[in-house]
Amino acid sequence: MTNLRKTHPLMKIINSSFIDLPAPSNISSWWNFGSLLGVCLIIQILTGLFLAMHYTSDTMTAFSSVTHICRDVNYGWLIRYLHANGASMFFICLFLHVGRGLYYGSYMYLETWNIGVLLLFAVMATAFMGYVLPWGQMSFWGATVITNLLSAIPYIGSDLVEWIWGGFSVDKATLTRFFAFHFILPFIIAALAGVHLLFLHETGSNNPSGLSSDADKIPFHPYYTIKDILGVLLLILVLTSLVLFSPDLLGDPDNYTPANPLNTPPHIKPEWYFLFAYAILRSIPNKLGGVLALVLSILILAVIPLLHTSKQRSMMFRPFSQCLFWILVADLLTLTWIGGQPVEHPYIIIGQLASILYFLLILVIMPITSLLENNLLKW
């Protein structure tokens, strides 16, 4: 009798994705982040569902409903902080996952990569709208500043902003629709993640060498299931440590003050995972230019496959490209730091230089270096 997992219509999909999937024998721990992102998404959907049972999306009661969750609901504080810090863990895994893709040339799987870029945009949109929901000072002013950026779009800008707001300022209508979108988007993300996996399994996983691994494949289960479980345990360890010891470490104290349209906080800044993009936005004095740079800082990922000039896929055997990759990482960390600083000397010029370097590295320096490496290898 044939095994049920190989014949049952539903079971065989799971079987071919997580059990009998042929996987390269040499993929390192950098390949764990896909499964960790799946776990993060499940944690966020579950904690978010329980939060939504107690949250009210009304400007008068939103802030106090979050207070109620933390004080009166059984383990409400735990659910709330798991959700807030779960978002941080989500982005840490996302950045490492994208970084892995850049380093090892995984972007050569075009469909998988482009859906990944789409997923990144969707997660960023979801996180932004989620940050608005507690209706603290930083929620309100963050929403005001970021939605206002759309007014830089010529001709339709101001109408578009008022249409998104549902009025002439960020108010009840805005909060209600942000809650609706924040609830539905994670399910769209889950569906997109399914398509992401579908396209990945068409080609099979890449591996650190960037060479074909067809000659040396091993079954996903038990080898990579056990490896993924270790990754998940480490993720849960870090998340629970953060939640139980310093839940507000990554948050903004201003968000513990109820939203007040008449009082602007001295430094408006987004959550830490948006600071690099925020620094790029601020480094350009022109509003439309800043918005374009902001969008392009993420959208640039979509053109990376076109900029691949090396004859090798991975950076594993390309020391010059490796150096540039780590300079890019350092540059992004610098931008993240600058995004959290006030707009004054010397932070302005550092931010501008880091922003220029970011685009130069990806668009010019790295492709030229790859060509140089080809010549050094006489390819």
Swiss-Prot record:
Membrane-spanning residues: 33-53, 77-98, 113-133, 178-198, 226-246, 288-308, 320-340, 347-367
Membrane topology: Multi-pass membrane protein
PROSITE patterns: CYTB_CTER (PS51003), CYTB_NTER (PS51002)
Cofactors (names): heme b
Principal place of residence: mitochondrion
This protein's record includes keyword Membrane: yes
Record flagged with keyword Mitochondrion: yes
Signal peptide: none
Family: Belongs to the cytochrome b family.
Protein name: Cytochrome b
Organism: Sorex cylindricauda (Greater stripe-backed shrew)
Lineage, opening ranks: Eukaryota, Metazoa, Chordata, Craniata, Vertebrata
Gene coding for it: MT-CYB
